[in-house]
Amino acid sequence: LLMDYDRNAIKGGALRIKEWDYYLIANNDYAVALTIADNSYMGLDGISLLDFRKPWQHTSNVMSFMTLGKRHLPASSSKGDVSNGTKKYSIRFKHNGDHRILSFHMDNFLDGKPISGEIRLENPEQESMVIVTPFAEKDTAFYYNQKINCLPASGSVEFDGQTYIFAKESSFGVLDWGRGVWTYDNVWYWGS
């Protein structure tokens, strides 16, 4: 990363701090997306499954209130584990140096049907995209983001009697690592 991130050094107001780790793993046929976010006034854990062949998608989010940094998202994308959940769901991102393990389950993902999966992302030595964007409207507002693209992915997801296989030869992941203090009214563009 370009600069060190320290949540405690932010002067933009405790309720304005936004932090998330978002992973998308995809191939030509389907994708799964996983989110753990601590947006201070609210936390969000999300699982999305997309089937490009139908086309079809479903997202199930669990929100909590006033997380205020209690999720302890890491100050760097290069180390640190992230996990959250209850008895009914869990999402875990484990960083093992040369690879990452993403594991998850949700008892009621859609219509009472569970979803579960485990994906391994290789961490090759490669470039990534990093931006640090100030907001002209407010001098304490900023967006610090790193996107690590094209991470070779392998693993599977189980949902509704179907196994979605992610083969290393044809499946790739992206980590969208975001931290910052946003202005109240803004426009957000996302691409990878």
Question: Which residues are covered by each model-predicted region?
Answer:
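Structured soluble/peripheral alpha/beta segments that form catalytic or ligand/cofactor-binding pockets
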Residues: 1-192
